[in-house]
Amino acid sequence: MSLTNEQIVDAIAEKSLMEVMELVKAIEEKFGVSAAAPVAAAAAGPAAVVEEQTEFNVVLTNCGTNKVGVIKAVRAVTGLGLKEAKDLTEAGGMLKEGASKDEAEKIKKELTEAGATVEIK
């Protein structure tokens, strides 16, 4: 049975991102090719547009002196349970991954008001 290109595209569209990445890797290995775009020498064209970062990671670096307030803020932001929020507050670490700029700034403001030191990366 021969599949049409449309059937193949539809089948790929139904897969998750991880499954598609595995498929690409398998195709690369099977046919000895790379899915990376070819690198061309810079021509006398317009300068490359610098893309603005759209996803940010919010990292708790220090809980400060108001640990209870920071734990409450961490719970509100992450939805974690009390123990998990306490552990994260004490150890520091990633609060939110892939947040929008507005969301990252909002989280930073809430935690800074509670007394924590927060970085946006």
UniProtKB/Swiss-Prot annotation:
Pfam family, one: Ribosomal_L12_N
Highest taxon of the lineage: Bacteria
GO MF entries: mRNA binding; structural constituent of ribosome
Keywords in alphabetical order: Ribonucleoprotein, Ribosomal protein
Keyword rRNA-binding: no
Family designation: Belongs to the bacterial ribosomal protein bL12 family.
The protein's name in its UniProt record: Large ribosomal subunit protein bL12
